[in-house]
């Protein structure tokens, strides 16, 4: 086998290995580690889980117990759909107008009687300041993210956490939400609004070509940090 053939076979084997490894999992723009939030109950004092007595005819988890109930998330590892719709509209304005004026008149004719020309001292000062500023910001985020019940709290509320990754044309978008919901706020379609999620953490980030182009270069950031004007 000549050396050229060996090189060709080595390149082909390497390409096959790369394709096999790339097919083993989803292709991310960069290394991705899903976020996991370690949620702790703020104050569990006085909150005790409701446990049925041993002789109760109603036992949670039995097949018969689901005959007359809906399929909403109630236990750990159950799924619930979170409909994110966050709207933030903030406006602020400030107007300041300050004026200060002082005037001083003093005559010294009584001390200089031998002179016909009167002498007087006059002085005055005026200062003023006027400032006007305003700011406005509007944000809207709409998405649907399936979440998993990570923990059932002692009072029956559910701690949920969900991720969603969307890859389109080398642009990767990450959705994340976590928080506490009440089972009563979950509708018949097993969904809940983000406005009903307490202690919520909602993140929407992107990685890829578009996100890189929207970010200022490191040299521009360095010059902006040094430039005083």
Swiss-Prot record:
Its main location: membrane. A lipid is attached at residue 24 (N-palmitoyl cysteine). Residues 1-23 form the signal peptide. Keywords: Bacterial flagellum, Cell outer membrane, Lipoprotein, Membrane, Palmitate, Signal. It is found in: Cell outer membrane; Bacterial flagellum basal body. GO terms for cellular component: bacterial-type flagellum basal body, distal rod, L ring; cell outer membrane. It is a lipid-anchor. A lipid is attached at residue 24 (S-diacylglycerol cysteine). One of its GO terms (molecular function) is cytoskeletal motor activity. One of its GO terms (biological process) is bacterial-type flagellum-dependent cell motility. Belongs to the FlgH family. The basal body constitutes a major portion of the flagellar organelle and consists of four rings (L,P,S, and M) mounted on a central rod. Assembles around the rod to form the L-ring and probably protects the motor/basal body from shearing forces during rotation. This is Flagellar L-ring protein. It comes from Anaeromyxobacter dehalogenans (strain 2CP-1 / ATCC BAA-258).
């Amino acid at each position: 086998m000549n050396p050229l053939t060996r090189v060709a076979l080595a390149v082909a084997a390497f390409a096959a290995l790369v394709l096999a490894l790339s097919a083993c999992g989803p292709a991310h723009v960069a290394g991705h580690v899903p976020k996991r939030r370690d949620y702790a109950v703020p104050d569990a004092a006085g909150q005790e889980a409701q446990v049925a007595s041993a002789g109760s005819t109603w036992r949670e988890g039995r097949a018969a117990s689901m005959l007359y109930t809906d399929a909403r998330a109630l236990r750990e590892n159950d799924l619930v759909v979170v409909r994110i719709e966050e709207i933030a509209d903030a406006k602020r304005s400030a107007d300041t107008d300050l004026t200060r004026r002082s005037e001083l008149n003093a005559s010294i004719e009584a001390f200089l009687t031998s002179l016909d020309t009167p002498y007087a001292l006059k002085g005055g000062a005026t200062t003023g300041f006027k400032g006007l500023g305003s700011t406005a910001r509007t944000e809207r985020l709409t998405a649907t993210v399936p979440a998993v019940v990570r923990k059932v709290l002692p009072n029956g509320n559910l701690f949920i956490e969900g991720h969603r990754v969307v890859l389109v044309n080398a642009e990767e978008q990450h959705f994340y939400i976590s928080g506490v919901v009440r089972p009563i706020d979950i509708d018949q379609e097993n969904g809940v609004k983000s406005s009903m999620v307490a202690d919520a953490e909602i993140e929407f980030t992107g990685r890829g070509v578009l996100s890189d182009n929207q970010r200022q270069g490191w040299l521009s950031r360095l010059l902006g940090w040094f430039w005083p004007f």
